[in-house]
Amino acid sequence: MEGPTHLKATNDHRYEEKTRKREERETIDIRKEGSRGEKNNMDIISILPAECISHIVSCTTPQDACRSSLVSHLFRIAADSDIVWERFLPQGYKEIISSSLNSLSKKDLYFHLCNHPIIIGNGNMSMALEKQSGKKCYMVGARELTAIWGDTPPYWQWISLPESRFSQVAELNYVWWLDIKGYIETKNLSPRTTYAAYFVYQLSSQDNPGTAATPVTLCVAYEHSAVAVEHSVILDPVTYEGTAPPHARYRGDGWFEIEMGEFVTEEDNATVVCSLVETSDYNCKSGLIVEGIELRPKE
């Protein structure tokens, strides 16, 4: 004869078994419902015209468009369409691209502009696109910069280098005062964007230690602004005698760059001034080669 303890254990086991089976049924029902929901969503998507999906994708970003192409074959067709990538190209792009690029799809043209800057502004500026966002990147070439005694041959000279995107770059022969400025109109940049400005340069084999080791003052500010943040750096891309950490970064294209500062494009008709100055040390400076000042959206 079974005792009370054995009956209780049997009842507990039956209860646990019923509970387990009920939970399994509920899980199966949930999965079926989820599957039906996903199927319904895919059915809704499948009945949308590809052009409609393209318009939806065009309201996102280039990065999101690339991701959406992985969803399905239909999405890939829509995400690769000219409707999408035309939206990501800068306004007025047809006026500045070469006729040889007209045969490219809008997507191929977009990535071409990301990887191959276009020379504009009488050959003294370049424009490219930032790959993830499609925002504009600009470089102001040395010919568009102003420098003390920049037009005086004994102090500066114009040379050609194969690694430069421009036909000419500026080489410093010798000066005692170093003052270089670049002026950028915000209407040429992407609106409501934080930009960083970079001084792009080399130091020649005839570099004077006074150029590489002497701190220079960098500043980026709106023209006529009462607020201007300055900071000092050294141009030497390696630590100079252990006195300071290097500020320069090798770009991988034969040039070094130093971040000058940042700003936000809040106005369409404002001018930003980027400056590099050293006028307190009267040592002779030479051997600096300037390609330009580049402006890129801040990550």
Where would I find each of the regions flagged by the language model?
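A positional/structural detector of protein chain ends, strongest at the extreme C-terminus
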Residues: 1-3, 298-299
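Intrinsically disordered, glycine-rich low-complexity segments
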Residues: 14-36
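Residue-level marker of intrinsically disordered, low-complexity segments enriched
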Residues: 8, 26-28, 40, 51, ...
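Extreme N-terminal basic, low-complexity initiation segments
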Residues: 5-13
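Membrane engagement elements in two modes
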Residues: 2, 34-36, 80-81
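N-terminal Skp1-binding subsegment of the F-box domain
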Residues: 38-77, 100
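Short intrinsically disordered, low-complexity coil segments enriched in acidic
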Residues: 1, 24-27, 105, 229-231
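Plant-skewed but cross-kingdom recognition/interaction modules and surfaces
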Residues: 47, 55, 73, 77-78, ...
